Amino acid sequence: MALSKVKLNDTFNKDQLLSTSKYTIQRSTGDNIDIPNYDVQKHLNKLCGMLLITEDANHKFTGLIGILYAMSRLGREDTLKILKDAGYQVRANGVDVITHRQDVNGKEMKFEVLTLVSLTSEVQGNIEIESRKSYKKMLKEMGEVAPEYRHDSPDCGMIVLCVAALVITKLAAGDRSGLTAVIRRANNVLRNEMKRYKGLIPKDIANSFYEVIEKYPHYIDVFVHFGIAQSSTRGGSRVEGIFAGLFMNAYGAGQVMLRWGVLAKSVKNIMLGHASVQAEMEQVVEVYEYAQKLGGEAGFYHILNNPKASLLSLTQFPNFSSVVLGNAAGLGIMGEYRGTPRNQDLYDAAKAYAEQLKENGVINYSVLDLTTEELEAIKNQLNPKDNDVEL
């Protein structure tokens, strides 16, 4: 069986069927959910900052606070619209700042907290109590704490959301198998921020985002739209620039993403790139056009469900370590396979094709109808020799 004989028309037929539906499904977000407005954005940013300055911080609620901060940047009205457009029945809780009295070592103290149903006043108070301990330690060590080391630095919330952007890149796997890659990438891109904040612990923050998204899947819709809005806004801080790069890389619109990752060097970070094993097949274009029609979210919502995207994706070959077959055939690199493939014929064909590419060192780019700019980007990215590119 050769890959060129594999027919992948089922996706188009199913898409036509789904498009004819006259009905929509309404989902419930459960009880009241917190939807903060712009006016509490500064306070949510400070909550993120308190967690970041706290040495050995407990990041159990950091993912939730980060998502709430993203909502506050979108605003209450737009967040509600995003959820309703996604088919969610929403009962929204307004969020305000109030004074909370809490006993601390036998002494009553006052804290400014938010009226959140998802995070008690006591938990918010405890976050501030722990951060004050770390702040006092910083004062002793530094004498004076520079603005960029403080808990109220304006980029604290975006630092936390940079970790969220990395987590989003791994959601298609359906589990936390991408956590190691998230940690490694965060350690690299946020290295300057980690020097500023001892509480910036990528592993703990990433796990917190995984947990909040698993518990509240509607937050994915909110975060995707926030990421697009944030990345399309000109200007901003250095950390906002880092976030835009990370998010657009995940979303599929970064300049290193060509044809949804078919030829991208970092294919393992791309959702629909996993689907495109056929680097010399016309179906690659079909996958790409289908992805364009669905929008960037196709990577998040469809790779687990539609037959084409799951054909050679992580969901179809869960034990294929290092690279999935889509990467292997697209780049001519084979990883180690452990376990029994669901479709042995298809696996054997893909393996033979990938090994052929690897042996010959030739990738046929001509079938993708690439523009001059895209082809140049490939050359710059993969650094092929002239005789390694078949045009």
UniProtKB/Swiss-Prot annotation:
Q: Where in the cell is it found?
A: Virion; Host cytoplasm
Give the recorded effect for residue 48 to S. Answer: About 80-95% inhibition of viral RNA synthesis
Its GO biological process annotations read:
symbiont-mediated suppression of host cytoplasmic pattern recognition receptor signaling pathway via inhibition of MAVS activity; symbiont-mediated suppression of host cytoplasmic pattern recognition receptor signaling pathway via inhibition of MDA-5 activity; symbiont-mediated suppression of host NF-kappaB cascade; symbiont-mediated suppression of host PKR/eIFalpha signaling; symbiont-mediated suppression of host type I interferon-mediated signaling pathway
> Which of the residues bear the PTM Phosphotyrosine?
38
This entry carries the following GO cellular component terms, namely: helical viral capsid; host cell cytoplasm; ribonucleoprotein complex; viral nucleocapsid
The answer to whether the entry has keyword Ribonucleoprotein is yes
Q: How does it assemble?
A: Homomultimerizes to form the nucleocapsid. Binds to viral genomic RNA. Interacts with the phosphoprotein P. When in a monomeric RNA-free form, interacts with the phosphoprotein (via N-terminus). Interacts with protein M2-1; this interaction allows the association of nucleocapsid with the matrix protein. Interacts with host EIF2AK2/PKR; this interaction inhibits EIF2AK2 phosphorylation of EIF2S1 and blocks EIF2AK2-mediated translation shutoff.
Question: What is known about what this protein does?
Answer: Encapsidates the viral RNA genome by forming a left-handed helical nucleocapsid that protects the RNA from nucleases. RNA replication depends on the availability of soluble nucleoprotein. The encapsidated genomic RNA is termed the NC and serves as template for transcription and replication. Together with the phosphoprotein, sequesters host NF-kappa-B in inclusion bodies (IBs) thereby inhibiting this host defense pathway. May also act as a modulator of the innate immune response by sequestration of host IFIH1/MDA5 and MAVS into IBs.
In its UniProt entry, what is this protein called?
A: Nucleoprotein
According to its UniProt entry, this protein's organism is Bovine respiratory syncytial virus (strain A51908) (BRS)
Origin organism lineage = Viruses, Riboviria, Orthornavirae, Negarnaviricota, Haploviricotina
